[in-house]
């Protein structure tokens, strides 16, 4: 069996940890959302289950009718993902939900169809209307609590906090200039401020004494004589002091004690006083108590309501319900587990499961937050403000969560409709069942809208496997609930210390989205709360262990972390007494005894694409960014070639992108051809697994997807082996470009300004040839005027134009086509208005005429040439119009299908019985198995399984069996689950086939009779104007293709394949390309492939040694000879092998010319752009250029007849046809537009005719 070639490396030891599955972020999130494969009663309260439990039960307004949710059930997809792409439909499953309705007539249960829900393919994508889409994860501000500070205009620092819920009103508190704290509810209504103490009272702390007790430590002090005065004067009372007999108040809680007050108290025989420790009259709480206009719970509630809703009558009931609704009703206010976790962590509350389940606000939270705010104000060192750009305060919303939020809004909309229907239902005439009051539209339309229109549901970038992989790992700060591109400042976009190992500092787009769209680092994972974690090795007593700990950004703050490249001895202890480490985002030289953790790998810093750049550490960050982005634009080539100089990530990137086919279990290859590979399982040779290969499919970006087998019959394969290559892969490794022999030198000025000179040899060898596939579609509909028809019989078209069309009017496969050729012939009925008056008259006299159709054929658009590689026809079948022969043929077909279906089911049953036997036969039952509905014991604990018991189990379904968890029963459950899913899938496939035989393609759009898709493949060779690039951001445009004989050559006669400009290196500071050139030359000569991972690559000295070992000049420079003259160039030139990519910006897609075409309606000037068949704008500066040359006639022609002189251009067209050559220009339409504009301003402008 063929294996991936080993790459030579200078790395001392391999990484301790393997990369996680690179698309886990997508798959894991959606799996948790749907919980496919779990029984209804085993489902956790997350995802879709959580939404249903949140919204239901729904009660009618009089509470007589209750609708409860019981469980949901997902069907099986009707078509495979590939078939959905082919048919242009959505890859989805049906969602059926079981409800229980209780009303005055009794209890009724029913399963209600709730529409379809798109499901994820195993590659982490969705197929929506036949196009693969990706839902990008969103980074947003985490719910929870944030403490901030801002500077007042007077120079004071004002502290504030903000409690941000997952859903509901924001609560903000801010100090003002007088050290009073004001509460704001909802940012939008910032002007409505409430004193913090009033708000606390409204929460239920009614008396001043209660409030003081919450904020201060209380001590009792005795008051016996005037000696105690010295201690007590100036202290703050914690409770009211009053004479119980006469109810006379001597001091109020919060008051400052004075000598006079104390004397009065002493005279009244008051012996003890409650004092607030550490309180003084300048303390914010004491100040606010003095300022507070309210003194009781009721007064505070009313004051709160008045400020929140000025103008409305402030009744106690209204006020209480408002505050309850705002913060204490789980349907309106939800912190979410995340918000509660962040809040409890910051304020030091317990972190147990019970505490985290509390999703609404508590009184203690507000008190705790105010205490923390006051600590900040008082300068407590342990209290700190939060950095909103720190990854501890930003979290990721993945696919599952985004769709869960959509489902929530859909069901909330549905809730209102259900309540209305419950109220309007007439019980006297009909019985109420769930199906009558539930409308499935709400949920289905919300999901359709999200997948089709949301900013985060994107058409997948499928240029090559890396583009696909990166798109799934992308993080966006844009989208609903996120940032706005225009308003996002510099700080949000910037690289932050907490990004280390979590978000790649390099890979982000150039332009307006810079820093807002980022990529997940290679080892990063997302935890249950949505925070990004990165792995570290734990260091214990100076020994670096192999234990791995995944840490979020806030936990990492407290750790001292050494670099992965720190020197260790054979006992994994630090060699040096000091090493470079990080603490709280700062790098410093740390004593190794203080180190607590160590990086897992140097590449944990960067994303996968950036990790594919060799010698990244020698490139400037700006160029590395371009290198990362341009690798995603590389076109898969016809002949792939893995890079000589790689980084070791190539194989993993190819595998996780899903481009290659990987063996899922050990076995032996039994059969191979271009379309499939069959492997017999090692442990069970009768079980065969077929791997279907993708052949010449069109990707989203029009490139070609084709898989080629790499194994032969008889090969032994191990799980994880590569058995077939895909697009842009070579023997299981990523192969985006070609290894090219380059010289860095100027050559006759042709490589000025980053231009690239290439040898004609590359064109002859098809080195950079790629295949593009275009899809053209035509539909025949049933129109008001009659049916459209796909036919070869097209009016006014010569026979030679129809030469390649078949009898049915569809082009034959293999035909070469060019612009204007007919692909599918179609005729459409003409409407009466399209006929000339005389024709209408003749038809009125002589009746109908046959030629009342017009040509509406599908033709090849300009700029497309190629070969027709595939044609797909979809059509509906009409039961009534079938002939007897067709009906007989259909019956035979259906009989064969049924026979095949029964066979498949019997094979499946035999396989299942064998598997059950292998697992259970002659084994002892570890526990009893009970029938869920009848409560019968099917298998007693300790029973030895015999054939009879196994057959008994075989007839039961998984839902009905109650099995305690243990190893044997866990395997049994998964076997049962797989078997039931396979049975379901067979049944769905059988029904789909039957439907197809009877009705044709029933899922065509309404009104469509027939649909034809034609695929045209074109071979694109490299040509002048194509964009090329290396992996270091060194991009350029092909400026000249030089005959091989004219290219510079080495002393041994070998010609250089490409010439690059040496001036492109120094100012760009991407020296990685030079090092790659040298190492590539040495490795090519030695016949090896090398890997130079990020920060652990080949040192310069090792490259020199390799060059000398291979007999090459140590400095990598050689003398070259001019191919044109044969003379030697004066100086030596750097030559070597560099990996160059061809990018998807091909000149063939951009070049465009117009002779005639459409004009704009208002200005009558030609439209712009290739898509509109537009013209080239001749603007103000171009006019100046022609004026400078004094070419008046040419100018007049350009500005009038070639542009917007309507009558003039008609005349010139006629004169050209007649062969005359005269220019009579009239008034340009833009002049008329100008006059109309001026008249619109109320100026009476009219052209005057002046006699000559």
UniProtKB/Swiss-Prot annotation:
UniProt KW keywords: DNA-directed RNA polymerase, Nucleotidyltransferase, Transcription, Transferase
Q: Which reaction does it catalyse?
A: RNA(n) + a ribonucleoside 5'-triphosphate = RNA(n+1) + diphosphate
| CDD domains assigned | RNA_pol_B_RPB2
Query: What molecular functions are annotated in GO for this chain?
Result: DNA binding; DNA-directed RNA polymerase activity; ribonucleoside binding
EC numbers: 2.7.7.6
Name the top EC class: transferase
Pfam families the UniProt entry points to: RNA_pol_Rpb2_1, RNA_pol_Rpb2_2, RNA_pol_Rpb2_3, RNA_pol_Rpb2_45, RNA_pol_Rpb2_6, RNA_pol_Rpb2_7
One Gene Ontology term, aspect cellular component: DNA-directed RNA polymerase complex
Instruction: Output the HAMAP family linked to this UniProt entry.
Output: RNApol_bact_RpoB (MF_01321)
Give the protein family.
Belongs to the RNA polymerase beta chain family.
How the protein assembles, per its UniProt entry? The RNAP catalytic core consists of 2 alpha, 1 beta, 1 beta' and 1 omega subunit. When a sigma factor is associated with the core the holoenzyme is formed, which can initiate transcription.
**Stated name of the protein:** DNA-directed RNA polymerase subunit beta
Q: What gene name does this entry carry?
A: rpoB
